[in-house]
């Protein structure tokens, strides 16, 4: 079977393309999948070719982001590509990352942190913490961790209003909770 994009090479990969409410499967050759074919915009930016080493994963990541954004009524193109911010290390933009399907280097995570958090929050309906199922053995640990975090926030507020006596009591409670947490960790 010939590649559905270039009609020149033998098709080797099956790619699912999702746009609006329509999912379409395409059979493409390795050349088209890797972005070396003229129909692919990545060919215009050869310095980013090194970031395209695992194309099947890249397609999957890109498709997941596009699907989730579309499902929740978000125009992924508009949200993701508002500005052309570049990573100081690898010089990739958010558009390049979405096109390739993965980050170019470790600094990309810090550079695009706010943009990615915004997209994930919109897709997840405002939730940024895991709220799904957890193993029963973890319930006590998670509850204890949350209690320590709440006490730390309360301690900061007490220090801000200079209620040092109450802050000392809360500090001691936090120490006790941390000790309890370490005991549970050692038992596990």
Curated annotation (Swiss-Prot):
Induction description: Up-regulated by heavy metals such as Cu(2+) and Cd(2+), but Zn(2+) and Co(2+) have no effect. Forms part of an operon with ctsR, mcsB and clpC, which is repressed by CtsR.
Keywords linked to the UniProt accession: Metal-binding, Stress response, Zinc
Question: Example GO biological process term?
Answer: stress response to cadmium ion
- Show where the record puts the motif CXXC metal binding motif 2: 29-32
Residues covered by the UVR domain: 145-180
Keyword Zinc in the entry? The reply is yes
Q: Which InterPro entries match?
A: UVR_dom, YacH, Znf_PARP
Q: Where is this motif: CXXC metal binding motif 3?
A: 87-90
Give an example GO molecular function: copper ion binding
Per the record's keyword annotation, is Metal-binding included, yes or no? Answer: yes
Per UniProt, the short sequence motif CXXC metal binding motif 4 occupies residue numbers 105-108
Q: Where is this motif: CXXC metal binding motif 1?
A: 3-6
Q: How does it assemble?
A: Interacts with McsB and CtsR; the CXXC motifs are needed for the binding.
Give the protein's biological function.
Activates the phosphorylation activity of the protein-arginine kinase McsB. May function as an important molecule for oxidative tolerance in various types of stress including that of heavy metals. Binds to Cu(2+), Zn(2+), Co(2+) and Cd(2+) via its CXXC metal binding motifs.
Note on file? The mutant where Cys residues of three CXXC motifs are mutated to Ala (Cys-3, Cys-6, Cys-29, Cys-32, Cys-105 and Cys-108) is still able to bind Cu(2+), probably via its fourth CXXC motif, but loses the ability to bind Zn(2+), Co(2+) and Cd(2+).
Q: What is this protein called?
A: Protein-arginine kinase activator protein
